[in-house]
Amino acid sequence: MRYLPVAALLLVAALAGCDSASDSASAARPEVSRPTPRYPDGQVRFDSEPGGRGYWGRASVSSLFEKGVQVAMDEKGLLANIADAPRVAPFQPWAVALYEYRQRNGLKDDPIRACIAPSGPRHLHTAGGFRIIRDPTYDRMYILFGGGNRNWRVVFMDGREPPNPEEVSGTYFGHQAGRWEGDTLVVESSGYNARFWFSNGGLPHTEALRLTERFSRPDFDTLKYEVTVDDPLTYTRPWTAEWTVDWVDGGEIAEQFCEDRRDGLGPSEPTSAGE
């Protein structure tokens, strides 16, 4: 079964009226915003409260483009007008040429088709949803993903600094160091390889990529996400993108594996837990 984007999964579930995780994601948001949940020590809680269930589901956009830019894309990150490609981000000349090639080629060289997991902000656009869990025992945050082969990210919260590229390199998820700035979780990552795509639509990057992500929860049902992309070999300057993600109350992140889908067709469709 072909991998379906989040928007398609939500539409199918809504039309069918089924009681699935995707259907929950399409449910109406509460008319009155609920307060941001917190741990007993006052720190923002990004996961469900004790005894509750839920996860972060649908993002407000389907791909990356620089903050303030207005471009039309479909759920896969394909531009409605290829002439808009140079406006998406401040590309170096070689990078915009590669981005346009990938767009014109219908994203056929997307590594996810060969079961190579996405990384960086693209994780937040994969079907299946995600959770952000605090681990005070080991002073870490874990970001668990239902899609993208059920990967997880480990964010070190023990005060360590992001390593230099010569110290850590060639990884898919990077070395991730986090800290709190008020109620905002700030995660700095580096040490990436260039074999994955960090966005739907095929934005290029090199091993010089550094990401600064900012997670905040202004109310119970909203996650605000901001990412600054810094890769001087690919872009002429650092640039920032942002979007929001909706909370799916009472659901569980979906199960999705890709081990048996190495035929170039892409991962199979995720299913709800227990199906």
What are these regions (language model features)?
Residues 6-16:
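Bacterial N-terminal signal peptides
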